[in-house]
Structures are given as C-alpha cells and as structure tokens.
Swiss-Prot record:
Phosphoserine found at: 12, 14, 21, 128
Coiled-coil ranges from the UniProt annotation: 71-136
Entry's Gene Ontology BP terms: formation of cytoplasmic translation initiation complex
Bias (Acidic residues) ranges: 41-62
PTM comment, free text: Phosphorylated. Phosphorylation is enhanced upon serum stimulation.
Residues modified to Phosphotyrosine: 255
Name by which UniProt lists this protein: Eukaryotic translation initiation factor 3 subunit J
Main function: Component of the eukaryotic translation initiation factor 3 (eIF-3) complex, which is required for several steps in the initiation of protein synthesis. The eIF-3 complex associates with the 40S ribosome and facilitates the recruitment of eIF-1, eIF-1A, eIF-2:GTP:methionyl-tRNAi and eIF-5 to form the 43S pre-initiation complex (43S PIC). The eIF-3 complex stimulates mRNA recruitment to the 43S PIC and scanning of the mRNA for AUG recognition.
Native organism: Rattus norvegicus
InterPro entries hit by this protein: eIF3-like_dom_sf (IPR023194), eIF3j (IPR013906)
Region listing for Disordered, in residue ranges: 1-111, 218-247
Record region (Sufficient for interaction with EIF3B): 1-70
PANTHER family, per the entry: EUKARYOTIC TRANSLATION INITIATION FACTOR 3 SUBUNIT J (PTHR21681:SF0)
Length: 259
C-alpha cells in the first residue's frame, strides 16, 4: 500500500509539473518580439496598416495647408500692386488739381489761354480717373483698331494718325465733309497753345498755296489745248517762216492762194 501510494504521489507530481510547464499561447505570441504586447497573432499587422492610413491623412492635411498659403501670397501681391497704382494715380490727380487751383504766375496767360489750359488739365484728370477705375475693377478691353490704341510715343501717334485719316477720308465725297472737318479741327485745337496753333495755321497756309498753284497750272494746260485762231496748220507755217527773219519771198502768199 505504501508503495502504491508513493507511486501515485509521484505520478501526481509529474502531472502537476507537466501542467505548470505548459506554455500560454498568448504569452508565446507576445514573447515572439511583436510590438503589440498582449495581442493576438495577426492583430499587430492590422494596427500597422491603420498607422499607415493615419500617415497618409497627415500628409494630405499638410498639402492642403500649404496651398492656401500660396493663394494668399498671390492675392497679397496683387493687392499691393493695386495699392501702388492707386497711390500713383492719386499723386497724379493731386498734381493736376494743384495746377487747376494755382495757375502759373511766371507766364501771363490770356483768358482764352487760361480756359484752354484748364480744359486740357480737366481732360487729363478724367483720363486718370478712367484708368484708375479700369485697373481697380480689372476691366479688360477687347476692342481693336482705333479704339484699342492708347498712343504715348511719336511712333504711336503717327500710326494713330494714319488710322484716323483712313477712317475719316472714307467720307470725303460727302457734301458735309468740308464743314465737318472745319468743326472737327476747331474742336480738337481749342485746348492747344498759341504757338502750336500757329504751326498748324502755317501748315494749312502752305497747303492752300500748293493747291492754288496746282489749280493755275491745270487751267493753263486746258487753255493751250484750245483751238488756235486763224487755223492751226496755217498759223504753224507762218510761225516757222517768221523764224527765218520774216522774209517769205511770196511763198506764203502763193500758198494761201493755192489753198
């Protein structure tokens, strides 16, 4: 009996030893060097994928944050340009306004000259206001030809003048063309200085003299082409004989009798 009990006790101890020596599968996975601690097998892989998604979201957020900064900087540059142009236009307007209020004292102007100077400055101010409005509201002109031109140099005005001439001379056959030009020249010259008006007047005077010479030459040519009194052939022969000292030897008389 004692031997049987001892054997049973030995088997019991062996069973207990085997029981306590069993490895916990959860612990085994955890002891395999995974970063998840007490996670099941494969669970750490899911978490890694999730972490990658978070990284993508963070990158997208950073890109989204950078884009508005670029837009803001561009808008800021445009706003600064507009402000700079506004300052320049305002300065120009102030100068024009000052000249309107305080006429030049160094040069004595007649009432007509003062009026012309004020009209010219007023026109400049209106043009300045118009340009400022266009730049402020971003007006983009899509017109062509004369309306699209904004001449500033000598060459620009030369080209501008050619276009105007081609446009106006289309109607030179009209009955109202001369009166139209008279009114047009008077209106466009009203703001000019006296010296400039004299230059234009002299230019027109020279043009008028040239036209008169051409007209006289044209009338003289028409008179030469008229009928010669006394007959063309006989008069020509008399002129030829007269070149020999006026002696005809009776040949002219014989010729006339024969005719």
């Amino acid at each position: 009996m004692a031997a049987a009990a001892a054997a049973a006790a030995g088997d019991s101890d062996s069973w207990d030893a085997d029981t306590f020596s069993m490895e916990d599968p959860v612990r085994k996975v955890a002891g395999g060097g995974t970063a998840g601690g007490d996670r099941w097998e494969g669970e750490d892989e899911d978490e890694d994928v999730k972490d990658n998604w978070d990284d993508d979201d963070d990158e997208n957020k950073e890109e989204a944050e950078v884009k508005p900064e670029v837009k803001i900087s561009e808008k800021k540059k445009i706003a600064e340009k507009i402000k700079e142009k506004e300052r320049q236009q305002k300065k120009r307007q102030e100068e024009i306004k000052k000249r309107l209020e305080e006429p030049e004292e160094s040069k004595v102007l007649t009432p007509e000259e003062q009026l012309a100077d004020k009209l010219r400055l007023k026109k400049l101010q209106e043009e300045s206001d118009l340009e400022l409005a266009k730049e402020t509201f971003g007006v983009n002109n899509t017109v062509y030809g004369i309306d699209a031109m904004n001449p500033s140099s000598r060459d620009d005005f030369t080209e501008f003048g050619k276009l105007l001439k081609d446009k106006i001379t289309q109607y030179e056959k009209s009955l109202y063309y001369a009166s139209f030009l008279e009114a047009l020249v008077r209106d466009v010259c009203i703001s000019l200085e006296i010296d400039d008006l004299k230059k234009i007047t002299n230019s027109l005077t020279v043009l008028c003299s040239e036209k008169q010479k051409q007209e006289k030459q044209s009338k003289a040519k028409k008179k030469k082409k008229g009928v010669v009194p006394g007959g063309g052939l006989k008069a020509t022969m008399k002129d030829d004989l007269a070149d020999y000292g006026g002696y005809d030897g009776g040949y002219v008389q014989d010729y006339e009798d024969f005719m």
